[in-house]
Amino acid sequence: MRIGMICPYSFDVPGGVQSHVLQLAEVMRTRGHLVSVLAPASPHAALPDYFVSGGRAVPIPYNGSVARLRFGPATHRKVKKWLAHGDFDVLHLHEPNAPSLSMLALNIAEGPIVATFHTSTTKSLTLTVFQGILRPMHEKIVGRIAVSDLARRWQMEALGSDAVEIPNGVDVDSFASAARLDGYPRQGKTVLFLGRYDEPRKGMAVLLDALPKVVQRFPDVQLLIVGHGDADQLRGQAGRLAAHLRFLGQVDDAGKASAMRSADVYCAPNTGGESFGIVLVEAMAAGTAVVASDLDAFRRVLRDGEVGHLVPVDPPDLQAAALADGLIAVLENDVLRERYVAAGNAAVRRYDWSVVASQIMRVYETVAGSGAKVQVAS
């Protein structure tokens, strides 16, 4: 099968959707399918040979974050050319609601079109502005996928169409077998934070507020930080506790897996804006206990606290105290921590790419059943 995929977000910056698209493309290629991926990227970006750059991206506020997207007349021409020469059996768009390559392609293309919805926000200015345009455009989508129940419900409420729920995929074995970082496990406890720590919704401020109580209980605890942000600024905010912070910066997937394998607990103190907890799944696959905010998306992944510790986020002014208590409870109780690890190991199997890719392929086969090709609309 010839599969065209479009990622709206730039591959110059790591992100969950980018990782999902890259891994899905790789799995489909190993199964013998021909895949071409169109995505924003700068000229110096290191991309596989089956990637086509849609050009440099620009930062646009989206879903409580800053997404790096590509739009405009030149991009329109590039998308049209890519579609015309692709001879695709299926076109798979990711996040077609964002002002991006995906939205452009949905407007230009017709035929067997699949779309995956990753976000669940109901406060999108983009959606408000484009809703009248999006609804008729969405009628062109033959197969709809939502990565979570939240994303599916948002799709139904905002645009009036249903979707099949297929979660994000994880290469479970690669996380389970990853080598630990040099010097780990440490003599003391290690808590891992992963994400763009300069984005408020990722919850680093909450974690810093929780840290004094955790340090009081575990004086040798280390907060291992992976991701993008201003490390010097964060050290300044941590004050006298800055010595407990270790920064790894941005890492590749192998580095992420090693960091997760090296921690006693993975902490996700997010305050909102999440539709699926893919990083929680990765941590569980690595054999690391999870302490996470009690958000709908995280609660679903952690099975209401069965496979990880959930921390109340309301009232907000008490979230840091609750997070500190949760971290201490899991760090000091080896039996509880090992129970979470064992339960997580069993729970993540449904997210393995061997399962998820097969579910997506069934959607492809359904929409491409007529034999019609993806074409540029006349």
Swiss-Prot record:
GO CC term, one of those recorded: plasma membrane
Membrane topology qualifier: Peripheral membrane protein
Chief location category: membrane
GO MF, one annotated term: magnesium ion binding
Coiled coil residues, start to end: none
Entry binding sites for GDP-alpha-D-mannose: 9, 16, 196, 201-202, 251-253, 256, 274-278, 282
Function of the molecule: Involved in the biosynthesis of phosphatidyl-myo-inositol mannosides (PIM) which are early precursors in the biosynthesis of lipomannans (LM) and lipoarabinomannans (LAM). Catalyzes the addition of a mannosyl residue from GDP-D-mannose (GDP-Man) to the position 2 of the carrier lipid phosphatidyl-myo-inositol (PI) to generate a phosphatidyl-myo-inositol bearing an alpha-1,2-linked mannose residue (PIM1). PimA plays an essential role for growth in macrophages and during both the acute and chronic phases of infection.
Stated family: Belongs to the glycosyltransferase group 1 family. Glycosyltransferase 4 subfamily.
Note: Was identified as a high-confidence drug target.
Protein name, as recorded: Phosphatidyl-myo-inositol mannosyltransferase
Gene name, Swiss-Prot/TrEMBL: pimA
